[in-house]
Amino acid sequence: MAAAAAEQQQQGFRPLDEASLVAYIKATPALAARLGGRLDALTIKEVGDGNLNFVYIVLSDAGSLVIKQALPYIRLVGDSWPMSRERAYFEASALQKHRALCPDHVPEVYHFDRAMSLIGMRYIEPPHIILRKGLVAGVEYPLLAEHMADYMAKTLFFTSLLYNSTTDHKKGVAQYCDNVEMSRLTEQVVFSDPYRVAKYNRCTSPFLDNDAAAVREDAELKLEIAELKSMFIERAQAFLHGDLHTSSIMVTPDSTQVIDPEFAFYGPMGYDIGAFLGNLILAYFSQDGHADQANDRKAYKKWILKTIEDSWNFFHKKFVELWNKHKDGNGEAYLPPIYNSSELLSLVQKKYMTSLFHDSLGFGSAKMIRRIVGIAHVEDFESIEDASKRASCERRALNCAKAILKGRRQFESIEQVIVHVQSFDRD
């Protein structure tokens, strides 16, 4: 431990606490300027409720910002699980890249210090809250589906071979290959550990012990998850956020901001889309655990289902519109001299989007399963105090996810998926 700490100091890294953070800000003009230069009465709050990092909100009477520092281990576990600090570089660059493509929904980066693994960025001010917390509280966000569809369509289309030359695409892939440690973490916790006995797996025991064992013994499920894992590892389709769940999104009724892309890499588009949709389905199944006499949550559950439906349909529409607009550009996936009629292009688009839809359903289901029988669970369920009630909600979600994952190619529309989800919403 001491040797590791000494090596980090030689590299210019030191974990900041509130006192040393103030000194760091004073010595960094790009950050001091955001606080109006008034640095003698700062309010600092550590809010890192994630699994990996320290996150500080810094307020002065003239400005605000957020400081995020990556630690050399997984915060959720401790220094027994080391983790590269370079993830901060990939997060900062991903925020900058995605903001250039979708400025309405990605916060600005003010400062990045690679040696310190530190990002200074916009403080996404109240009344913004983490979307997952809003879903637990039963808050409706009327623009969420359209905003997320816009974000996903732009970030995925403009970083794919539908828009870019092979040369430019390969350069992007090469830049983010070094974020392999984060991708390997995903491989382990999403595609491997839930399907075997693993040290950090947990479930709502004893209620779900048999359910977790059934996942580990399900041969058909393992065949399907192996296919998804291969796609995740091998298919550099577009530049992904890499962790696009409902705790990576901050919202108000009229604003949506996507944060925390430290898992960013080039991978299958369906992984981002599925992460978002799968977490909405988890939120749906959790609602009965949050219902009370004042609010049975039935109307809210309908809103969640409508949001899932709209998110895919808006995304499909926006993505194909971008494709049509740029079909004669530099993209090398479908060269205009070959796909030279509207009829042929329409056939290509239908096949492409159907495949993407099925990928999204598969990855979304995998993300649901890992949140119930794997390492990192979600507040949607964890905040249900009655363990028996929590397990009942989780079991419905788990059974739904397994069925969608196995049968994803049978679905022809998101509306069919919604009907399928509802069929599992009973004991």
From Swiss-Prot:
Functional note: Catalyzes the phosphorylation of methylthioribose into methylthioribose-1-phosphate.
Subunit-structure text: Homodimer.
Pathway(s) per entry: Amino-acid biosynthesis; L-methionine biosynthesis via salvage pathway; S-methyl-5-thio-alpha-D-ribose 1-phosphate from S-methyl-5'-thioadenosine (hydrolase route): step 2/2
Binding locations of ATP: 49-53, 68, 122-124, 260-262
Presence of keyword ATP-binding: yes
UniProt-listed Enzyme Commission number(s): 2.7.1.100
Name of the protein described by the UniProt record: Methylthioribose kinase 2
A molecular-function term among this protein's GO annotations: ATP binding
Pfam family, one: APH
Family named by the database record: Belongs to the methylthioribose kinase family.
UniProt entry keywords in alphabetical sequence: Amino-acid biosynthesis, ATP-binding, Kinase, Methionine biosynthesis, Nucleotide-binding, Transferase
Gene: MTK2
Root EC class: transferase
TM segment ranges: none
Catalyzed reactions per annotation: 5-(methylsulfanyl)-D-ribose + ATP = 5-(methylsulfanyl)-alpha-D-ribose 1-phosphate + ADP + H(+)
InterPro entries: Aminoglycoside_PTrfase (IPR002575), Kinase-like_dom_sf (IPR011009), Methylthioribose_kinase (IPR009212)
A biological process from GO: L-methionine salvage from methylthioadenosine
Binding site for substrate: 51, 243, 370
Keyword Transport recorded: no
